Amino acid sequence: MEQELRSTPSWKLDKFIEVYLLPNTSFRDDVKSAINVLCDFLKERCFRDTVHPVRVSKVVKGGSSGKGTTLKGKSDADLVVFLNNFTSFEDQLNRRGEFIKEIKKQLYEVQREKHFRVKFEVQSSWWPNPRALSFKLSAPHLQQEVEFDVLPAYDVLGHVSLYSNPDPKIYTILISECISLGKDGEFSTCFTELQRNFLKQRPTKLKSLIRLVKHWYQLCKEKLGKPLPPQYALELLTVYAWERGNGITEFNTAQGFRTILELVTKYQQLRIYWTKYYDFQHPDVSKYLHRQLRKSRPVILDPADPTGNVAGGNQEGWRRLASEARLWLQYPCFMNRGGSPVSSWEVPVDEAWSCILL
């Protein structure tokens, strides 16, 4: 697949995305069907017979399925199970293992029922207190297996709508607990709906560009192995490049792709954040944000969780990815018809320290 992408002419990248990366309708329906089966199981029967009452307040689809950026053939989904039993972030950290254990037990038990035709293949975890339960789901009506990560989470946000922002007090509590526990970014799952909403309303073509960048990242991962920066960092970098460099619904895909790879090569200068869900207005949040933004670069703060620097702590991974990006910038997918390089968007690598409402 690497050969196909790098040798694709720049003016045919949209076609490449359409043919190789966009999931077809039947595939999407399969994944949706599998998710519905699992959501019903988690909400209605998983905790039905537990000794102590367990209340699932909601099950939220996260990851690429939730954001609408799934790649063709990549049938995976994150399901975040919000439990009213958790009373704090620390409580989630300490008790998530017991709920994962219960979900695992119920998956095994339901398989014994003859009328239940869905099969679960649970992946073993060696961690004593795992963040997620990973398994594969298969069923007669599905064309292929679907991989799931189920993550128990504290329902700190309650009801979330597209147009309302969290109370700043939620972030002050988050920051306080993360500092006392030394667990920055540990509770990002609690903000899954905000992460999803941040991307969900974006233009279709931007989501296609995200798919292209994710595909490129997967090719790099196959070639380079670990360590690499997290894929989410590349997704956010793509959104940032589009917002600051173009921002229109229709754009040149090759120019956008080139811009993102150039930003990867400048990783040591990156300092990126958004003020959509949190900002500098609350003194405690402002103090913490300034501290985060003074950290060694690259810094890319999760737009939903200020404690999560999704680009941090992996200089070697960025160095290796940047080296690969420099190679790719010489390939035909970044050349015009006459052989000259495709131009890139003008994008600052360092976001100004001001309250930017996007």
From Swiss-Prot:
ATP binds at residues 64, 211, 214, 231. Coiled coil: none annotated. Produced as a latent enzyme which is activated by dsRNA generated during the course of viral infection. The dsRNA activator must be at least 15 nucleotides long, and no modification of the 2'-hydroxyl group is tolerated. ssRNA or dsDNA do not act as activators. Residues 14-61, 201-211 are annotated as: Interaction with dsRNA. InterPro entries: 2-5-oligoAdlate_synth_1_dom2/C (IPR018952), 2-5OAS_C_CS (IPR006117), 2-5OAS_N_CS (IPR043518), NT_2-5OAS_ClassI-CCAase (IPR006116), NT_sf (IPR043519), Polymerase_NTP_transf_dom (IPR002934). Interferon-induced, dsRNA-activated antiviral enzyme which plays a critical role in cellular innate antiviral response. In addition, it may also play a role in other cellular processes such as apoptosis, cell growth, differentiation and gene regulation. Synthesizes higher oligomers of 2'-5'-oligoadenylates (2-5A) from ATP which then bind to the inactive monomeric form of ribonuclease L (RNase L) leading to its dimerization and subsequent activation. This is 2'-5'-oligoadenylate synthase 1A. It comes from Rattus norvegicus (Rat). The gene is Oas1a.
